[in-house]
Amino acid sequence: MIHKDFLAEKLKLFAEACTRPLFEAHLHGDLSNIGEVEAAIGELLEMNPDVCMQLAPASLTTMMSLQGIGNAVSQEVAYVLRHIARVYEKTGDQAHASARLSQAEAIERAFSCDGTQCPKEFEEFEQTIC
């Protein structure tokens, strides 16, 4: 029960850290704070954010498995990576868009999740951008 509560709190904080920068990026094409979202992914996965975002998709999923929380956070991470990819694509940065989408798809395959489905922590965000 304590682990479940701890994980729920981590996911809540993750969603809070991601929501505003993703909203600004979607609404205004403002990528200035997208690094905060990428840092939040690293923190959630208990990895150095700079290293985490540079990992090849297969390496990222391996590290998530080794951390032992991959199954518990995979949908949320894949969902956020897909949004980052979409924002990069909208602003013409195809290289970063492709990298983030590849990471999201690898997570979805490795952990049998669907990053296109909105996790409950992001429902309010999803409603504001649609």
Protein language model regions, located:
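Residue at a conserved register position within TPR or TPR-like alpha-solenoid repeats
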Residues: 24-25, 81, 88, 108
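Structural register within alpha-helical repeat arrays
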Residues: 20-21, 40, 77, 84, ...
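The tetratricopeptide repeat
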Residues: 73-76, 80, 117-125
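Residues in the short coil linking paired helices within alpha-helical repeat scaffolds
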Residues: 29-30, 93, 100
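N-terminal alpha-helical interaction modules that lie
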Residues: 1-74, 109, 128-130
